[in-house]
Design a protein with these regions (language model features):
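N-terminal secretory signal peptides and thylakoid transit peptides that target proteins
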Residues: 1-15
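C-terminal segment of N-terminal export signals and the immediately downstream linker at the start
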Residues: 21-61
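A general structural signal for short secondary-structure junctions and capping/turn motifs
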Residues: 53-55, 165-167, 182-186
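Short amphipathic
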Residues: 60-67, 189-195
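Histidine- and aromatic-enriched segments that form or immediately flank copper-ligand environments
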Residues: 61-177
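Short, well-ordered alpha-helical segments in soluble proteins
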Residues: 163, 179-183, 197
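Low-complexity, Pro/Ser/Thr- and charge-rich linker/hinge segments at domain boundaries
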Residues: 176-192
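Conserved small/polar residues in nucleotide/adenosyl-binding loops
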Residues: 200-202
Length: 202
């Protein structure tokens, strides 16, 4: 398990089959999140993007890939980080209260990881606490989180495996759960913006 200093020297994770969509692929598949077909107004993540899904037997299936990335904090300022599907913060996941969801998480990192769905009501085995509520997701493995969404609100996802390091280097994202009953006065626009402080020595 690398220290924060050692992390800078990590050159890359093992190459795995890339089932997880990238930002460009997600933008091409934006129709998944059209308000006319989904019954809600999609959020716009100002410093991110929305993860598309496929519908399989009534289950919304998403793919996340934890991996090392090159992240540009500002023009000319780039650093090695960890992220999901090529970005940090990771893509925003949008679902609706009452949805049955399956989120397949592939670990392309050099150490084990998990995903904890912060503030979400779900079965203990889906809560993402490695070694307690589930096995650690080891390098090269894929773990399936599957649960029914029982509430609405704005939440986040992040690891519960060496979280002081893994969150610090970029593993986090937004989870937006739309209410089953539409708002009486829907907003014209709905935005997400995730704040994360990074200290870079240049």
């Amino acid at each position: 398990m690398p220290s924060r200093r050692q992390f800078i020297g990590i050159t890359g994770a093992s190459a795995l089959a890339a089932a997880a969509p990238t930002r460009l692929q997600a933008e091409a598949a934006r129709s998944n999140n059209d308000s006319q077909t989904q019954g809600y107004r999609p959020v716009r993540t100002l410093n991110g993007w929305t993860l598309p899904y496929t519908l399989k037997d009534g289950v919304k299936e998403f793919h996340l890939r934890a991996e090392e990335i090159d992240h540009e904090f500002a023009p000319g300022t780039q650093a090695k980080c960890w992220g999901y599907n090529g970005s940090t913060p990771g893509p925003t996941i949008e679902v609706v209260e009452g949805d049955q969801v399956r989120i397949l998480v592939t670990n392309a990192l050099p150490e084990h990881t998990t995903i904890h769905w912060h503030g979400i009501i779900l079965p203990s085995g889906m809560d993402g606490v490695g070694g307690l509520s589930q096995p650690q997701i080891r390098p090269g493995e894929t773990y399936a989180y599957e649960f029914e969404v029982q509430q609405h609100g704005t939440h986040m996802y992040h690891p519960h495996a060496d979280e002081m390091t893994q969150i610090a280097v970029g593993l986090m994202g937004m989870l937006v759960i739309h209410p089953k009953q539409p708002e009486a006065k829907p907003a014209d626009r709905d935005y997400c913006f995730m704040l994360h402080l990074s200290l870079i020595h240049i």
